[in-house]
Amino acid sequence: MEAARSGIEDVTSPDRISQLPNDLLFRILSLIPVSDAMSTSLLSKRWKSVWKMLPTLVYNENSCSNIGSLGFDQFCGRSLQLHEAPLLKTLTLELRKQTDSLDSSIFPNIHSTLLEFSIKSTGYPVYYSTISFPNNLDVFQTLVVLKLQGNICLDVVDSPVCFQSLKSLYLTCVNFENEESFSKLLSACPVLEDLFLQRLCSVGRFLFSISVPSLQRLTYTKEQAYYSNDEAILEITAPSLKHLNIFDRVGVFSFIEDMPKLVEASVRVKLSKNEKLPKVLTSVEHLSLDLYPSMVFHLDDRFISKQLLHLKLDIYDNFQSNLLLSLLKDLPNLQSLKLNHSHPSYNVEDQPCSVSEPSSVPECLSFHLETFQWIGYAGTFEEIAAAVYVLKNARCLKNATISLYSRGTENGLMMIKELESMSKGSIMCQLLVKF
């Protein structure tokens, strides 16, 4: 009674955390290493089975300091044997050392219905953890998402497996022993819809064949090559593809079939190596593309797209007005145009240019363009000519936003004044100049 009056809690009262619902306890335990979560089973009868029902398990080799003499693989395998949740939403393994026993020590001990499996290896780059997928394990039949990252070597030639439910596959810096391993992995995913590839690795110069009829989204990105022969060659057959994202200026991409369902694409490639690429982009509604001077030699009537509504152009080197205007005449239904000149390169003594205006105003300017955005506008003669032409001829333009790349306050103020004085073909146009 005295303790209650003084505001001191009775130490014999049940701990409040044990009264929390399981869902909240699961969230709390998911914030600590699995080895620590297992230790909570010693607290009381209430806690004995809480960790066994966790819907998410993250095994981090760097955080497992209290597993005694057990190796990391053995600890993972034994703890998974004790796990009782019928549904395991996510299982993550973060490896630090090389291991070749995942298929024998861990995979067979997963008894829950597993939806997402992630393996990340951060060991020394020279050493790879070899992963094989046994074909007699039910755990792979329920997987919806599979993520592999780091120093991992995949070998599926001798152990074919069927990921019959897999919808999303993420491969980041994963090594393949041969072309067949990559092809068999994809052929084992009959309902795959989302494929994310970042810097595929190989010993030698392989052809990576992507033949997935169900594929809807494909992303391939590549950082600066680590090795001189690290040049991707991808052969793509994906007739159901809707979204395409490629960022690799040295790779070669061959599209075997047309992709009539493609509606969105972001492409950062060297067109001189990928001359067939423009043909597969003719059905897109949203397109993000590099624009550089030499590109004019690789664009022709194959680039005409009546479906394109939104275009973003990343500009490199000096801006060329003629190249932009030649593109616009082939995009009759374009509604929004964004120019991003992040690092403009121009001579201080900008020389007057001769801009060849189209014989007729592009249809998109006369009837459809509503939004115009320019980032990195430096006020060169070429840029002024393009700005004047677009603002004057865009009859339906509602919003124009121009962000300046200026060499000084005085120069910036002059550009603002110049832009605001340009005539506008649309009475609805709201011009915003950012300095």
Swiss-Prot record:
Keywords: Leucine-rich repeat, Repeat
Disulphide bridges, residue numbers: none
Top-level taxonomic group: Eukaryota
Keyword Repeat part of the UniProt annotation: yes
LRR repeat residue intervals: 64-95, 146-173, 174-199, 222-248, 266-291, 316-341
A Pfam family this chain is assigned to: FBD
Annotated SMART domains: FBD (SM00579), FBOX (SM00256)
Residue ranges occupied by any FBD domain in the UniProt entry: 353-404
Keyword check for DNA damage: no
Domain F-box: 14-62
SUPFAM superfamilies assigned: F-box domain, RNI-like
Name the record gives this protein: Putative F-box/FBD/LRR-repeat protein At5g56810
Organism from which the protein derives: Arabidopsis thaliana
